[in-house]
Amino acid sequence: MESIEQQLTELRTTLRHHEYLYHVMDAPEIPDAEYDRLMRELRELEAQHPDLITPDSPSQRVGAAPLAAFSQIRHEVPMLSLDNVFDEESFLAFNKRVQDRLKSGDKLTWCCELKLDGLAVSILYENGVLISAATRGDGTTGEDITSNVRTIRAIPLKLRGDNIPARLEVRGEVFLPQAGFEKINEEARRTGNKVFANPRNAAAGSLRQLDPRITAKRPLTFFCYGVGILEGGELPDTHLGRLLQFKAWGLPVSDRVTLCDSPEAVLDFYHKVEEDRPTLGFDIDGVVIKVNSMALQEQLGFVARAPRWAVAFKFPAQEQMTFVRDVEFQVGRTGAITPVARLEPVHVAGVLVSNATLHNADEIERLGLRIGDKVVIRRAGDVIPQVVNVVLSERPEETRPVEFPTHCPVCGSDVERVEGEAVARCTGGLICGAQRKESLKHFVSRRAMDVDGMGDKIIDQLVEKEYVHTPADLFRLTAGKLTGLDRMGPKSAQNVVNALEKAKETTFARFLYALGIREVGEATAAGLAAYFGTLEALEAASIDELQKVPDVGIVVATHVFNFFAEESNRDVIGQLLAEGIHWPAPIVVNADEIDSPFAGKTIVLTGSLSLMSRDDAKARLVALGAKVAGSVSKKTDLVIAGEAAGSKLAKAQELGIDVIDEAEMLRLLGV
């Protein structure tokens, strides 16, 4: 008997620990499925030994104590939780228990709802006015979150319509839609603040802020699903009828609530919701099934912590625990280096998962992850599995830190991470095998080297057949080699060779753009070319010197500097020049000596030009002593607006900057 008592003590201690983390700290350490498993184990053991049940056992209550920082509200009607089922057999057994208890052959009608993954709240209205709001807490006493709830736009401060009870306590779930969750985390990453592991944690953390102004900035919403106190009024005699009445009074109710007149219909509802789950826009972890008749609900009553007339039918767990065996680093097509956790395989949401993304070095630091750790893995819908958190309380003794590479694991080039950016990148854009296809496609594109007839499919084949490794290899191709590609005859092959020969004559700006330096678009490339004049001067420029170019800040300057600092990139540039790529020598323009309305002015082009290409317009303006910038600022002297000009035009008008159209530009150019 002693060993059974010890088992019970350990189970209760473990459950209390995780209840505290979940309800009080808003930092759950294990998946819900693992908590449910521990609770089932405790209940089964207590059922076998009822004399060992204690009043403070987690099986006898709902949750954990509320935070001391909030004042407390006592629930006049306890806020109980629901029992769970996890498969069709268990649901059908629940259905039979209800039928047997009612001792009636009549068919039951079930009201089925979504099981929202948020925070349960109670909201009290007196004469239709919101008086107070509280969390579930331990089911008997919750935290007073009235000030925070009043900031949630979905929750009416005053009910609308007629026949509103004198006192009405509605219950529901506060949750955070997926889009809002992503926005909060994006802002947190930008400002270096805490990133939430999932929408449920974000909703709880937002609702339980001591400063309501913070809550007001979070896009929380709410669905109503039940009632607690009802005084001085009446409600319909069915659960669905009550929800519809709440909706008429202005309370939000999910539009997925459905009546089912048989267990088979309930199962159909369950599977349909499971199928739609990835597209809902918010997290759910199952469906809730309730007897629709309020009279039958009353007849069925309650057990210690849950009603007999309702059950939560949970979906297969989207979170499971496993171990990180190693961390490897993948290089994407843009050079982004992503750490990937190699896991001890585990089934998550019906799929065997052996890898999970770790995003970047900041995420590894946030998690405090070490190789060998026990972790929680989450897989939702088609989302790539990710590590949610480390189970620190079960960290093995032999773990080791994750070391982020300083050199690209594919090509060996230096890895850069610009200040203010989370992603580390390979700087060997011209030689890196992982980036090869994308960098070559960019190099030959119309606005870059403009190699006519060399499309994406040709590049794909050239790389796959290992005919081409760097941009310089393109100019060594022969018609004979090209005929080895699919659907490439002798004539087409010769046309491509001719196009490559023609492309050798370009401009300095186009060449810079073709190199694919990160953050260097056409406008920035033109600015760099105009400012430095020669490739040699640009290659020798420091970060400070690069920032003297209009519209070039610290981030772009760092990318340019790191690109030219990488020896492999300089080698490829040397090979390109040796293959005959050239451009006209720069014409030094002194704006003071030019008689032109554009001389010495900083100009921005926006919208579509119909009579002249944007490149030609830029070239003519620069030749007349203008500086062409990519964005509008107080330093801008003139904006030339083509068709469908957008935000740049609006900003120019806001700043009072002169604006002319394409026709006026052509007139001033003398075209």
Swiss-Prot record:
One of its GO terms (biological process) is DNA replication. Zn(2+) binds at residues 408, 411, 426, 432. This is DNA ligase. Residues 593-671 form the BRCT domain. InterPro entries: BRCT_dom, BRCT_dom_sf, DisA/LigA_HHH, DNA_ligase, DNA_ligase_AS, DNA_ligase_CS, DNAligase_adenylation, DNAligase_N. It catalyses: NAD(+) + (deoxyribonucleotide)n-3'-hydroxyl + 5'-phospho-(deoxyribonucleotide)m = (deoxyribonucleotide)n+m + AMP + beta-nicotinamide D-nucleotide. GO terms for cellular component: cytosol. One of its GO terms (molecular function) is DNA binding. The gene is ligA. CDD domains: BRCT_DNA_ligase_like, LIGANc. Transmembrane segments: none annotated. Its cofactor is Mg(2+); Mn(2+). It comes from the Bacteria. NAD(+) binds at residues 32-36, 81-82, 113, 136, 173, 290, 314. The keyword Heme does not apply. Disulfide bonds: none annotated. Gene3D superfamilies: 5' to 3' exonuclease, C-terminal subdomain (1.10.150.20), 6.20.10.30, BRCT domain (3.40.50.10190), DNA ligase/mRNA capping enzyme (3.30.470.30), Helix hairpin bin (1.10.287.610), Nucleic acid-binding proteins (2.40.50.140). The active site is at residue 115. DNA ligase that catalyzes the formation of phosphodiester linkages between 5'-phosphoryl and 3'-hydroxyl groups in double-stranded DNA using NAD as a coenzyme and as the energy source for the reaction. It is essential for DNA replication and repair of damaged DNA. Keywords: DNA damage, DNA repair, DNA replication, Ligase, Magnesium, Manganese, Metal-binding, NAD, Zinc. Belongs to the NAD-dependent DNA ligase family. LigA subfamily. Its EC number is 6.5.1.2. Pfam families: BRCT (PF00533), DNA_ligase_aden (PF01653), DNA_ligase_OB (PF03120), DNA_ligase_ZBD (PF03119), HHH_2 (PF12826), HHH_5 (PF14520), Nlig-Ia (PF22745).
